[in-house]
Amino acid sequence: MEKLTDFVQEHMGDDLTRLVLDRKKWPDIDIDLAVSCIQSRRKLKGKVQEWFSNPSLIFPAGLSAEQCSSTATAVYKAGLAARIASSDGDMDAALEKIRGGWRLADLTGGLGVDSWMFSKFASEVLYNEMQEKLCMAAEHNFKALGADNIRISNQITAPDTIMEILGDFGANIIYMDPARRGEGGKKVFLIEECTPDVLTLKDIIFERCRHILLKLSPMADITMVCDRLGSSCRQVHVVATGGECKELLIWMDREWEGEYEVVAVELPAGYPDVEPARFSFKVSEEKISPLTLFGRNDIMPSLASRENTTLASREESRDLPHYLFEPGKALMKAGCYNLISERFGLHKLGRSTHYYITEDATKAETLKQLGKVYEIIDCQPLDKRSMKAAGKDYPRAEVTARNIPMDTDTFRKKLGVSSGDDAHIFGLKSDAHGNLLIITRRR
């Protein structure tokens, strides 16, 4: 094994196709495994840095490294599991009070990143994986990482094997991350098409354990998934980081009776040292929440007196500043469009334009944690004249088009601007004012 890991370190920057073609040069090395390790390490760099930095780890399947959790999402997941398992759902329990004293069974172990992170929070973890190569690699890697509280199981997760897998392991919570690839490696999104099929397993699992935590694709339809899973759905955590929605976490509680809660979570840079932003709501709240639109009588900084003025003079003379809020990926995936407006006192540009206006600087600062906030410099009807003027004043700017008769690339070309600087020009549709050109600066 040491020869293999040394070889991997020496050839991290090599052309992998060339390594495969030249395999006869290294008769003592399993080149296929070495290439898989190199591919995996490249994917893990910056994603799970502690694993990348440990030269002793081996990875027999490159796809597993691509699909595994990042350190940030794994930490969030483990913290959530700890709160669920050790406090029967008391989400306000202090983290220092819930470390240890509970057990988790991971029935779809994969590369093992989630099991490894769970082991840092739980007293014991059961890792089960159907692929023998992955299972053997995980056992080796856990030892190399010093994770000595993980049991290893190599079985297919199916209705007739659940009891055998769990054996005498008294799990407080069962975790599953169903594989989202069907025959021929094709991606699937319906929960019943994933492997294992949670719909056929959940009732059997509930005979042994009260809580189930599922990780699903961010592409999954939340309403459809919860309808299929039934009344035991208690919470749906929509987890985003780095400007991307990464995963859906479904907490199922055997004893739960009631409406499920949706929790939109934005993990900031520096997490877990920096607290994540959360926005929780129930679907029924969103349905009855009134829509507050940006109306005809609402005024933003205007370009009406553009002639004979410079950008500096317009900025100095404008009235109370307005802010444009662009919800983050977690909020958008969660489907929170009207309630965010109600809770923060925002005005939505249009029913289908999910951008919001506020004059309140304090609210704007808070909203930065849940998305992006821009200070509005100028705003006017979107037409040839306004685009020409904006392009002249801001030759370097970021550009976004939403719900107007052109996409972002076309809008950028018509403006004649190149990417860069701190200005951001939006082309957005307002129900009250039609298509608008809004010039902003990121806060």
Model region roles, listed by residue range:
Residues M1-R443:
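SAM-dependent transferase fold signal centered on methyltransferase-like domains
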